[in-house]
Design a protein with these regions (language model features):
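Low-complexity, intrinsically disordered terminal/linker segments enriched in charged
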Residues: 125-201
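Short, flexible beta-strand-to-coil junctions
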Residues: 32-39, 121-126, 152-155
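Intrinsically disordered, low-complexity segments enriched in small/polar residues
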Residues: 39, 80, 89, 120, ...
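Surface-exposed, charged secondary-structure patches
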Residues: 59-60, 64, 85-132
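Extended, non-catalytic scaffold segments that flank or surround catalytic motifs
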Residues: 1-7, 116-118, 140, 154
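Core segments of small alpha/beta cavity-forming domains
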Residues: 1-97
Length: 201
């Protein structure tokens, strides 16, 4: 499940335990919101989704491995904060849509004995002025940069261990940000998103 990671465009890292706690929380919370349990979460009186911290912890381990320990706290700005409620050990998350973020396109897969390397293209958001079509009339999605994702095995599943920029395959001339937040009434996750287990394709 690469989208909850790619959408926040993390800097290179060689061990997820060294990553910023806010990034780990955001990715894990979005993995919950896009995962198969999203329909089971309740809502508070303000229409915010209530996500148990235990589920966030589970998604963090699924995404980033068994050694990840989250520090639970409120993150985000005042209007769209992911509010942590220690009394019920849960997050109150506003139902929001993120726009202006990249989506992943797996360009290459290299399987090894206990690991897997993915060449991941970051496809920037499309606007009316930037739409391109190929000779067959299909929409062309050209990544603006490429990253090497190393996945390692944890039992039968894989988790993300490192992210490295592929400098010689970078595509210049296209920029994107890590997301502009805007409130919507419903969250419609991609049909292709699974349970949150990061499995090798």
């Amino acid at each position: 499940m690469l989208l909850p990671v790619v959408m926040f465009d993390p800097p290179d890292f060689t061990d997820p335990a060294t990553c910023d706690n806010e990034f780990l929380l955001q990715s894990s919370l979005w993995a919950c919101m896009l995962g198969e349990r999203r329909g089971s979460y309740e809502f508070d009186e303000y229409g915010r989704m209530v996500i148990p911290a235990a589920d966030v912890d589970a998604q963090a381990v699924s995404l980033f491995g068994p050694n990840i320990k989250l520090e639970h706290m409120t993150i985000g700005d005042m209007e769209n904060a992911y509010q942590y409620d220690s009394d019920i050990a849960s997050y109150h998350v506003p139902i929001i849509a993120m726009t202006g973020f990249a989506t992943p396109s797996v360009e290459k897969i290299v399987m090894k004995q206990d690991s897997c390397q993915l060449t991941v293209g970051y496809v920037p958001p499309t606007t009316v002025l930037s739409i391109n079509y190929d000779s067959k009339g299909n929409l062309e999605e050209t990544p603006s940069k490429y990253m090497l994702y190393e996945l390692r095995k944890n039992g039968k599943d894989f988790y993300l261990y490192s992210v490295t920029t592929i400098m010689n395959d970078s595509v210049s001339g296209t920029e994107f940000n890590t997301g502009t937040v805007g409130r919507v009434d419903t969250l419609t996750p991609s049909d292709s998103q699974g349970s949150g287990n990061t499995q090798a394709p």
